């Protein structure tokens, strides 16, 4: 899993 995507998901969640 890409850290960038994880950061985006973290922002949404």
From Swiss-Prot:
Alphabetically ordered keywords of this record: Amidation, Antibiotic, Antimicrobial, Chemotaxis, Fungicide, G-protein coupled receptor impairing toxin, Immunity, Innate immunity, Mast cell degranulation, Repeat, Secreted, Toxin
Cellular component aspect of the GO annotation: extracellular region
GO biological process, one term: defense response to fungus
Superkingdom of the source species: Eukaryota
Localisation: Secreted
GO MF assignments: toxin activity
Major localization class: secreted
Gene source species: Vespa xanthoptera (Japanese yellow hornet)
Protein name, per record: Vespid chemotactic peptide X
């Amino acid at each position: 899993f890409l850290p960038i995507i994880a950061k985006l998901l973290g922002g949404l969640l």
